[in-house]
Swiss-Prot record:
Alphabetized GO MF terms: metal ion binding; metalloexopeptidase activity
Co-factor requirement: Zn(2+)
Positions annotated to bind Zn(2+) 2: D183, E218, H316
Positions that bind Zn(2+) 1: H171, D183, E243
Organism: Neosartorya fischeri (strain ATCC 1020 / DSM 3700 / CBS 544.65 / FGSC A1164 / JCM 1740 / NRRL 181 / WB 181)
Main location, first listed in the record: membrane
Region spans: Disordered: 579-612
Protein's recorded name: Vacuolar membrane protease
Amino acid sequence: MARPSLSRSNPLGFTPWPVTVITAVVYLALVVPLLVVHHVVPSAPSSSPKGLNLTEAWTDLQVLTNGFHPYNSHRNDEVHEWLLKRILELINSAPPASEYESVDEAKPDIVVFDDTQSNLTFSGRASGLGVYFESTNIMVYIRGWEEDKERWWEDPHGRPAGKGGVLVNAHYDSVSTGYGATDDGVGVVSCLQLIKYFTTPGHVPRRGLVLLFNNGEEDFLNGARVYSQHPISQLPHTFLNLEGAGAGGRATLFRSSDAEVTKPYMRAPHPFGSVLSANGFEAGLISSQTDYVVFEGDLGLRGLDVAFMEPRARYHTDEDDARHTSLDSVWHMLSAAVATTEGLVSDASGRFEGLPREDGRIASGSGPRGVWFDLFGSAFVVFELHTLFALSVTLLVVAPLVLLVTSIALNRADKMYLFRASASPEDSDGSEAVLLHGVRGFFRFPFLLVIPTAVTVGLAYLVTKFNPYIIHSSEYAVWSMMISAWVFLAWFVSRVADFARPSAFHRVYTLTWLFLVEWVLLVISTVYENKYGLAGGYFVFFAFAGTFLATWISYLELFALPRKSEYATQLALPSRRASSHGSRLGTASGEDVEDGEDEDEDDDGTTAEATETTSLLRGQRTTFANYVRVTGDYLRDDGDEPRQPNLYGHEQAWSIHLPKWVWVLQFLLTAPLVLTFVGPLALLLTSALRQTGQDGSSSLFIYIAVAALTTLLFIPLLPFIHRYTHHIPLFLLCVFAGTLIYNLVAFPFSPANRLKLFFIQEVDLDTGVNHASLSGAYPFVHDVASSLPSTAGQNITCDLDLLRPKCSWHGIPPQVVQPAEASKMKDWLSYNITRSDAEPKAQLSISGRNTRACKLVFDRPVLSFTVADSAYDPRFPHVSPDGTKEIRLWSREWGHTWTVDVEWAADTEETDEKGLRLSGRVVCLWSDGNTAGVIPALDEVRRYVPVWVGVSKLSDGLVEGSRRFEI
């Protein structure tokens, strides 16, 4: 039988150096661009595109963020007036009507609504919370050229005609401890630039466009909810929400309603995001919310949520400022907003129109759930979920059938060496057989997968126990530890297995196991797609498709082998038949001899050619004293055949017939697909979750996620890693040792990745006693509190049972109300109670000095409540099913008096007298920290905390003053 020839210097051969170099280069060639895309923001253009002015946008951001401007601050009023002024400047700077005629357009009508009339009472999604809120929203309506010219909103019963419009939303309030550059200053300046863009000739929208500058998002999405009470809210059917949950970087597509409304985002020059983030919101992995839930869930619109997502350590702190973001980040969000909005307002179809709804929500229709993801930040893929479901089901059925048919064809061709221990020669009576060792390597995969994965999971538990917050600042040290441990162990286990039982079928068996594992994962993913509408498992489909093709190629490779019977016939020569129970002098088998191995084997693992000095009995099995033991019918071993020059190591002799370059194709079908689809998800999850431990989230979860993602990313190496040289694995062993020590002992926070602690000062206005407190990761929060000058000699008490442990001390008294306004603390707020004599009802009037936010907190829930002059909307129930324990009151006026009527249940099991009683606290909030000395306890914290600590607000107010009442 002719033997195929193969040059030992084959650069694509399945030998150590080609395998090591090619796999390493492919991984680096994909990982490096993924890291660059994730961390480097595309540069803003040197000159502004037509209709935009990036210099104006950056200047606007600097003006907007020159102070804290929460809803309950005087700076917020200044921002409101500045926005109105800027909007009018942009409108007045629009070209004259003659310039529009040159592009066959008419100058659009623009209407500005300064909503200082709307209000709303509603209940929170959390049980027991009610909210009354007054609007200071600003809306800019750019009439579409396809729309009627009527001013329908001036009619109390008027409704828009024609197709629905588009809403773009950003909130102009910040938190009381952050300047709001990315949350949501970049969104605000993007909306300002959209006014400029869509009033430029050539860009006039087809559909009506509403730009909403809402106020009050940070305090419970209040601004978006009260927007529903303005007539213009009836116009939009689709929306784009611009938000910030980080402090720079790229703006990612967090979530979207469906595939149809997502497609306009494909126009973005640098799209970024994955549907997995939307599934994270649905699964509750991300606890914070945006106005998206109001527009989609409460109002019935269909839209997208685009937001900054990292770093969380700067989110809601004084580092959310213009200095810590960039013009490139502004451009990234602005360019996406322009492209998406232009796609929505130019849509001529009726796909965003639906039948009228009985629940009062917008009739925007419905679209199929979507699957979407970016490719290296340059392209964006969107398709419908049912398409993925159909493809998944098809692949689940077709792939096993293809392998089954191929196996049958191999068997009929007598070339099915897989799972075959031996073969009989042609015309044999069955008493003579040749060992094929075709089962070798089948049981390796479980060890290759389980041992490295188990160790990385163990590392996750180890780091969580000894240094749970290290990933907060050193995420790539954690990744390096996990990757180096996993790859080294996978290599070590595979090399041990290959040394003990060399097999040319390591690759095909490992691919077969991978096929089975990923088939099961695809079944699970497909079930979740169909049952729960979760599309985040789309990467499993692509990974399985690549693994299937690679596995199929391995099966097709077997057609290159000789027929088993033909091979056995050649090997089982009658002249070499041994006697039944005999011994003969022999030499040790090449599989059992290690001494002198280098003499017969080149560096690349191929065996040297036989010469006249080579032992004729090489390859025989020996027992003691070089005697071969043979029992029963003689079983010829393929190792008994003289050594072939192109045989790798001590693998089966028939393997020289297998193509030596096919592994490259198999690797390129598996690893790049996994890296392309899983790599961005790994980076996305790391960025989104690595700094959530300080918020009370589970630290173990993120480490387990890193361990699992490490397995997913490097599992394509398993069919090939036994061919690796020792250089990379030993280097990774050193990396593992260093990163393990670092991750266990290094301090987890730094000035660039600060620990966020949450401040509040609570004052009993009846007694004057106050307690300042910090909440956050323990024991760091206690150490920081103990380092403050005012806590020296105090007993700091810490409540460790809370989600965020809270440490309190007697604080420096606040000065949020000037002595001229109220000489005593109890005069900071006033209330009056009028109780019904016969029923468990009462009316409470509440007002506070130098504030426009107060609340009522009851010791037991009230059945119902109403706020004087408030609007009510059936889309927003205002009483929780289990009653209301807290009523938050917000006003656009300073020192406003709220009148609240409450009714509670009489306790029939106790005395009537006690049943008619209601007790609780009246609380007012102060949130303006712009002036030094107003909240000296906060000033002290900011001045004296370590550089690795950032300060955020714990609640709506920085200072909460309360007085008790009993009715």
